[in-house]
């Protein structure tokens, strides 16, 4: 059982505001040994991407976070969205609630979207015993929202164990618990259609330094120096537009509601709400009301376009010239043996949301057409080539 101090580990971390420090090992604290690492990913996601279903893959990845967050209401824990899955860390004494929530999510993904979700549960102590490091920090991304940062080679080791030692660490495929907090995907929303790039393309990028310590931190700072600033954020007020009908609302309803009258009622209600939002925004534009709607302003800031989980992950809006310069920098760093990297470009960004309240919401962004999943595939190909 986790101690009371251990359980408050993540809640007690003070967030950093300087985004250039996300790779500095000094900002991180070791994950308590009595915690558990939870990893999820969608099996055979490449097939879904080729079928034009990457948004479904994204939705399942976010649903894992939403399900556990709802099941553990009141608990603060780190999580990182990875496109086709998620990484979480939890106190050991709440893991049964998380298992029930993820069992339900896996069953819903299979039944409603035809996607198979892999779930691994690994004790942090086992990862540390293998000689790897698990560390966590917090990054302030807005006045009201922090996100987790993960550091150390233990996260990548856990990911490899999830796939190579699936029989040992996989969550048993048991019948899902019906109803209750374990089956709560409330707050999972997909009301935004794909958001076109403002400049040229939306780029999903994963960069992994090949060396540790200050050398790695300097490499990451060099890359970040080209990509930090409002102009690179993939979501902005000027481009944020609701269109009707929402393209992915049916998938949202299928994930959140049982079949039958409840799902039909949810769809009708949400279609009407989204239509009202569209009409209001159109009226606002005609009346030349320039005051930004508070929620939309918060949305642009509460987006996880920058992440670190042992590798730098970003989704950025770039011009053709910015893309060329960035890729040249990355290619130079790759050929000098300093990094591995993968990227995927698409005309649009995808947004999947977790709404807990008027000022409590986070928005998970990815590039369309495969985004992080295709970037990860390219990075792995680089590693194999070495």
Residue map of PLM features:
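Regulatory and interdomain segments flanking nucleotide-handling catalytic cores
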Residues: 1-386
């Amino acid at each position: 059982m986790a101690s009371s101090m251990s359980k408050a580990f993540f809640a007690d971390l003070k967030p950093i505001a300087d985004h250039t420090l996300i790779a500095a090992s000094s900002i991180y604290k070791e994950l308590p040994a009595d915690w558990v690492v939870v990893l999820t990913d969608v099996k055979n996601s490449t097939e879904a991407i080729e079928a034009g279903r990457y948004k479904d893959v994204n939705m399942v990845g976010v649903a894992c976070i939403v399900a556990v967050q709802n099941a553990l209401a009141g608990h603060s824990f780190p999580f990182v969205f990875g496109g086709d899955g998620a990484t979480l860390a939890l106190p050991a004494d709440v893991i049964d609630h998380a298992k029930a929530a993820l069992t339900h999510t896996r069953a819903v993904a299979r039944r409603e979207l035809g996607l198979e979700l892999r779930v691994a549960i690994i004790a942090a102590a086992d990862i540390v015993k293998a000689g790897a490091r698990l560390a966590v920090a917090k990054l302030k991304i807005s006045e009201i929202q922090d996100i987790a940062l993960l550091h150390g080679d233990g996260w990548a080791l856990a990911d490899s164990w999830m796939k190579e030692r699936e029989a040992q660490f996989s969550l048993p495929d048991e019948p899902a618990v019906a109803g209750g907090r374990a089956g709560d995907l409330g707050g999972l929303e997909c009301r935004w259609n794909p958001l076109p790039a403002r400049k040229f393309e939306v780029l999903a990028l994963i960069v992994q330094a090949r060396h540790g310590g200050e050398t790695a931190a300097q490499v990451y700072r060099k890359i970040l120096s080209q990509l930090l600033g409002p102009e690179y954020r993939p979501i902005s007020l000027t481009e944020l537009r609701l269109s009707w009908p929402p393209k992915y609302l049916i998938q949202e309803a299928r994930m959140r509601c049982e079949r039958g009258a409840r799902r039909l009622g949810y769809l009708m209600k949400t279609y009407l709400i989204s239509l009202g939002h569209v009409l209001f925004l159109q009226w606002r534009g005609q009346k030349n009301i320039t005051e930004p709607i508070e929620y939309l302003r918060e949305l642009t800031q509460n987006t996880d376009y920058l992440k670190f989980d042992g590798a730098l992950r970003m989704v950025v809006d770039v011009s053709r010239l910015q893309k060329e310069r960035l890729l040249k920098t990355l290619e130079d760093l790759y050929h000098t043996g300093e990094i591995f990297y993968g990227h995927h470009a698409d005309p649009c960004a995808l947004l999947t949301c977790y709404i807990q309240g008027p000022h409590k919401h986070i928005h998970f962004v990815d590039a369309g057409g495969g985004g992080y999943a295709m970037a990860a595939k390219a990075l792995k190909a680089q590693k194999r080539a070495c």
